[in-house]
A protein has these predicted regions:
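Substrate/ligand-engaging "lid" and interaction regions
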Residues: 1-206
Length: 207
């Protein structure tokens, strides 16, 4: 099993002209990505000798089990992405970074990550806090304009795999629903029901 962790917003529409000027040729397949990257490979350390990916400048970990890295990443990176995006969009915020820096939405994201999703994982708390703090720093990357609408594609299956397990675990452990995750689901439903923005107001285009 392997895991790749890297935020890849896709085609850099805003900067493509400057990029082509720098390259001195047209490349319509340019993909933007953050500098951070992690490649986790479930294999013995000896494999590193046969596959010295680090010599190519890649951040690769050879580990006995990929599972805890997968669970941590899906829960504390993908999970918040999935719920913050519709909440941000319906609030008139288009970029992940701006959502994190928003007075209200920023607190919402922090609550979902630290007070709800983190409580559902069985990994060392300090390790989880450090990972979550690093994720927030990545979300705030000033060089990457990550559109929330790109994250909102296929929101229902994303929520089912990234957030619903945490919601169920939280309910089982705490005896109550996690309000942030419930709000995220409500925002997804609102968006897919036809909720649109106009002059700062949320309108419905269908019943």
């Amino acid at each position: 099993a392997t895991l790749v962790d890297r935020i890849v917003p896709g085609f850099p529409r805003k900067d493509i002209a400057a990029i082509k000027e720098k390259l001195q040729y047209d490349d319509n397949l340019v993909v933007q990505a953050e500098v951070f990257h992690l490649w986790v490979i479930e294999a013995p350390q000896e494999v590193a000798k046969e596959f010295p990916a680090d010599k190519a400048g890649l951040n690769v970990l050879f580990v006995p089990s990929e599972a805890p890295y997968h669970e941590r990443k899906v829960t504390l990176l993908n999970g918040p992405h999935t719920v913050l995006s519709p909440v941000a969009y319906l609030s008139g915020v288009n970029i992940v970074r701006d959502a994190c820096q928003h007075e209200v939405i920023g607190k919402y994201i922090h609550k979902v990550m630290f007070d709800e999703l983190m409580e559902t994982l069985n990994l060392p708390k300090e390790e989880l806090k450090k990972f979550a703090e690093d994720v927030l720093e990545r979300f705030n990357n000033p060089f990457v304009d990550h559109a929330v609408t790109s994250i909102m594609l296929n929101s229902f299956p994303k929520y089912e795999t990234r957030d619903l397990p945490g919601l169920k675990t939280y309910l089982q452990r705490k005896g109550e629903l996690p309000k942030g995750l419930v709000l995220g689901l409500a925002a997804i439903i609102t968006y897919y029901k036809g909720g649109v923005r106009e002059d700062g107001c949320l309108l419905y285009t269908s019943p």
